[in-house]
C-alpha cells in the first residue's frame, strides 16, 4: 500500500504574485515538488502561455505526469541545469519568470524511506534523486573525522560539530556495532553525543541532518548555479521569485540579488573614462520590494513555513 504525503506550498500567493504573470508569458518552475506552484501558474496562463517545470526527484516527475496540459512541460533534472534546458528549448532571453522553492518538500521529509528525517526511522539516504550519487550512510562510512566535522559546521552551523563527528567515527570503528544505515541510528547517536547542557528547543540532530542533506545533494552549489542560470535566461522585466528555508540559502539569494543589482565596481584611484566604465557593463537586476515572510496565519496552518523567506528580483 502506497502512503500519500501532502505538501502545502509555502508563500504560494506571494511568490506567484511576485512573478507578475502575463497570460501569454513563458515561465519556469525550477522546483516542481508536488506541483502547488506549477498548477497555480498554469491557472493564470492563457492559451499561448507556457510553463516548464524542473525536478530531480523521480516522485515529483511521477506527480507531474498527471498534468495533461499542452502548455506544460516537465524536465527531469537538477535546477542547476536551467540554463542548459532553456537553450535546448530555445528560451534564452524569452523567459518571463523563474520560481525557485528551495529546500526539502514535506513529502520528502514525511516519507521515512527517503531518509531525510530524524523523526522517522528509515534508510539513511537523503538523496533528492535516489538514482544518482551515494547515500549519506556510505559517505559517513568513508569520510574522515575532519571532513565530517567541516560538513556539520559549514552546512549545519552546529557548535558541537567536532563532538558529533567524533561520535560517528568512534561508532563505525567499533567492530561490535552494526553498520549505521538507518536514520534512527544516526539520530540516537547524535542525541547521545550532545552535551547534557544542550538547551536548544530543536532536536540535537536537526543541524547535523541538515548539513548531511545539503552536502550529499550539493545544494548550495546547485542554488548558486541556478541563480546565475535564471539571470542569464530571463527576458527584460522578467521576474525571479525565490523561497528559501534556512539562513545559508537566504544569505546566498540576498547576496546574489545585491550583486546583480549593482553596477561594476571600479577600484578607487584607477583612472577610467566614462566610455570605459560603461564597457564594463551595468546592473543586471533590481530587487522588488523587501523580503517576504509568512503570516502568523500561514505559520499556524503550516508550521514548516516558519523559517521561509521570499525574495523577488527583476531583470533590467
Swiss-Prot record:
GO terms for molecular function: rRNA (cytosine-N4-)-methyltransferase activity. Its main location: cytoplasm. It holds the Pfam family Methyltransf_5. Signal peptide: none annotated. Keywords: Cytoplasm, Methyltransferase, rRNA processing, S-adenosyl-L-methionine, Transferase. InterPro entries: RsmH (IPR002903), SAM-dep_MeTrfase_MraW_recog (IPR023397), SAM-dependent_MTases_sf (IPR029063). GO terms for cellular component: cytoplasm. The keyword Cell cycle does not apply. Belongs to the methyltransferase superfamily. RsmH family. HAMAP family: 16SrRNA_methyltr_H (MF_01007). Specifically methylates the N4 position of cytidine in position 1402 (C1402) of 16S rRNA. This is Ribosomal RNA small subunit methyltransferase H.
